[in-house]
C-alpha cells in the first residue's frame, strides 16, 4: 500500500529525471491496443525497429495503452509480453507510461478479442476500442475483475524502473460517459496504490475548462498533473490550471498539425514552462492517425499529417521536427 505523493516528493522526483520527450506509441502493425498486446499479433520485431528510430530521434519515453480483455484472457502471457516490450524500450533508453483504462471509442464498438477489423480507408483511428469497454465502466459486477487487473499489472511492475509513470485512465468521461466514469477513476487510483506502485500516478484532464467537476477531482488525485491539448491556442491556460496544484505537469497528448498545432509552436512553450510531453503517434500505420479526425478532409491529395512522426519506412515526416525533438530541454 502506498499513499498519494506530496507535491514535494513529486517535484523532487521530477527534478531527478531528464525532461520527458515522449510519444504515444503503438507499432504500425497494430490497429489498436488489443492487436498490439494479443499473443497472435504481438510484434516485437516491428517494436524494436520503431523504438530504435524513436531513440535516435531523441525520444526517451512512450505512452502505451493496455486492454483489459487481453489481460483477462491471458494474464501470464500478457505480462511476459510487457516484460519483452520493456526490455526493448530500455535498450533504446526509453521508459514507459502505461495506461490501463480508456473511454475513447473511435470504432464505435466495445472491445473484442481475436482478429481486429482492418482500418477503414481515409478514416482516422477507425479500429480503436475502449478499455474495459463503455458498458463495463459503471457495471459494478465487473469491478472485482477490474480490480484484479490493476492489482496484477501494477503490482507486477510496481518497482520496475523501466515503468516511469502509471496513467491510470485515458480521457475518462469521453464517448458521452461524462461523470459516470468518475467512480472508476477513483477506484483505479485506490487499487494502484493498494498494489504498491512506486512510480507516480496520473490521469489527464482533456476538456480543459474549469466547469468540469470531474477534472478537478482528477487533479486532486494525481501525483503528477497531466493534460491533453490539440489546439493552436490556449495551451498556456491549461498549463496554469494544472500548475495551481503545485505538482509537475505533463502534456500526455498533443500535436495536430492540420489546425496549426505544430512541433515548432508547442515545444518552446513546454520548454519555458518545464512541461514533459508525449505527442500523439510515432509511425504511420494501421491506426491511420496521420489522417485528420474530420473524414471529409482526408483525400488522396492530403499532404499535411495530423499526428505521427515517421513514415513506415523510418523516414521522418519533417526532418526539422526531429532536430527540435533532439534539442528539447527546459529553459
Label the predicted regions.
Residues 240, 267-268:
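Amphipathic helical hotspot of TIR/SEFIR-family domains
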